[in-house]
């Protein structure tokens, strides 16, 4: 028995009512909002369940130029441009007094060469409102507590802000829950990451940087002077603020006692260049931390569902790849769902999982090389041909799926070969 209320379909079951929708998205972050917008433009019915109330804080604040293409395709670019975020055109690296930078406009791949550095509370809220503008229904403070994928159409159990529990059935579920990793946790899809357990301590500050050589249009990664696998991010925002964080294995971070802000300040003081750069900073925001952020899953899709962005796999903050991977996954999934709803057979493993992982694996090779020191030796080496740097710049700009770039093919082997030349 079906009951129609306010254009919504409800399935009458014994002693309960199950709501029905075409697409259910878990999480209203970048992946969820972009997927919702794309699917609404296809005419699909979309419900988004978001555990938190927006705006809310998140890290992952330095976008990559490749992201602009996905925002444009989703019809969200204008809203982002008009928000007045900090312009970004590249990335800079510092290690042992050495400095190098990449201008993303000078890259191998075609496409956007500039983007923005964003406060995620504002950025994510903009994307969510854009998804709503396209007609997606977003329910904030609605938490998924269980999922059943055994029925023909999966059923999700949800708790609303008042503590009431209800169920919703969907033709397909997209998990865009980010670090919450709802489906991997509930369906036991999680698998160990190949990376050591690392953590990050971070905050926002009024930076008061008056150094003329500091380029606010670039994210900067600074390597700790005594510990090569420890590094700091400095992400300038508009209005004289920046995001500051340190990334290290948990054993290193545990050496420092006190509040997160005190720990971060002590570690920053160990790098003379960064300490000097921020000597006038106003530390006006409590620091936060995240531990064990790297994650993997046994599969990116299954019966009636697919995992988007960080819900599937998160590598590391070093190359700011998270939001770009989130957008790429949303773009791929929305295109496949359009075909699936048109009656085509879709092989999610070969048409979603494999293409997505191609770029993820390119970023993975870069991350691994960063922590072994190989990537640092490559980028500070002066003898490379300009085209080599353009190939690297393209991947740093997010074009990790561009097969015209030799660095995307056999990335780890090519990085090893380049490192061998840095003598």
Residue spans for each PLM region:
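Glycine-rich FAD pyrophosphate-binding loop
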Residues: 40-59
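Predominantly flavin-linked oxidoreductase catalytic cores and closely associated redox partners
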Residues: 130-274
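N-terminal FAD cofactor-binding segment of flavoenzymes
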Residues: 58-96
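Beta1/beta-strand and adjacent pyrophosphate-binding region of the FAD-binding site
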Residues: 17-29
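N-terminal Rossmann-fold NAD(P) dinucleotide-binding loop
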Residues: 32-33
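FAD/FMN-dependent oxidoreductases across multiple families
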Residues: 252-336, 342, 346-353
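Short beta-strand to alpha-helix junction loop
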Residues: 108-129, 254-259
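C-terminal helical "tail/cap" subdomain of flavin- and related membrane-associated enzymes
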Residues: 335-423
């Amino acid at each position: 028995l079906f009951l129609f209320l306010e254009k919504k379909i409800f399935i009458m079951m014994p002693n309960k009512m199950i709501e029905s929708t075409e697409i259910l998205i878990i999480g209203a972050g970048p992946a969820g909002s972009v997927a919702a917008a794309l699917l609404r433009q296809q005419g699909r019915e979309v419900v988004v369940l978001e555990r938190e109330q927006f705006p809310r804080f998140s890290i992952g604040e330095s976008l990559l130029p490749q992201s602009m293409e996905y925002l444009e395709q989703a019809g969200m670019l204008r809203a982002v441009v008009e928000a007045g975020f900090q312009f970004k055109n590249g990335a800079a690296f510092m290690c042992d007094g050495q400095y190098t930078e990449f201008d993303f406009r000078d890259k191998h791949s075609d496409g956007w060469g500039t983007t923005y550095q964003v406060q995620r509370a504002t950025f994510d809220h903009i994307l969510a409102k854009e998804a709503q503008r396209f007609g997606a229904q977003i329910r904030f403070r609605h938490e998924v507590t269980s999922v059943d994928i055994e029925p023909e159409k999966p059923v999700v159990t949800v708790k609303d802000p008042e503590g009431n529990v209800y169920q919703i059935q969907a033709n397909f579920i997209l998990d865009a829950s980010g670090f919450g990793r709802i489906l991997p946790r509930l369906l036991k899809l999680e698998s160990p990451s190949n990376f050591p357990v690392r953590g990050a301590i971070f905050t926002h500050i009024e930076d008061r940087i008056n150094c003329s050589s500091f380029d606010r249009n670039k994210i900067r990664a600074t390597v700790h002077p005594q510990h090569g696998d420890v590094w700091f991010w400095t992400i300038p925002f508009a209005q004289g603020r920046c995001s500051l964080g340190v990334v290290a294995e948990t054993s290193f971070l545990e050496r420092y006692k006190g509040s997160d802000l005190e720990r971060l300040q002590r570690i920053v003081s160990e790098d003379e260049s960064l300490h000097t750069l921020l000597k006038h900073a106003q530390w006006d925001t409590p620091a936060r931390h995240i531990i064990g952020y790297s994650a993997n899953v046994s599969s990116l899709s299954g019966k009636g569902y697919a995992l988007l962005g960080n819900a599937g796999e998160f590598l590391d903050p070093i190359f700011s790849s998270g939001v770009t991977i989130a957008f790429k996954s949303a773009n791929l999934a929305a295109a496949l769902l359009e075909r699936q709803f048109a009656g085509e057979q879709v092989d999610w493993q070969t048409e979603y999982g494999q293409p997505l992982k191609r770029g993820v694996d390119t970023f993975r090779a870069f991350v691994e090389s960063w922590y072994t020191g190989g990537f640092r030796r490559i980028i500070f080496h002066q003898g490379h041909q300009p085209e080599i740097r353009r190939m690297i710049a393209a991947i740093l700009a997010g074009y990790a799926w561009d097969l015209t770039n030799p660095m995307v093919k056999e990335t780890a082997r090519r990085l090893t070969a380049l490192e061998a030349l840095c003598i």
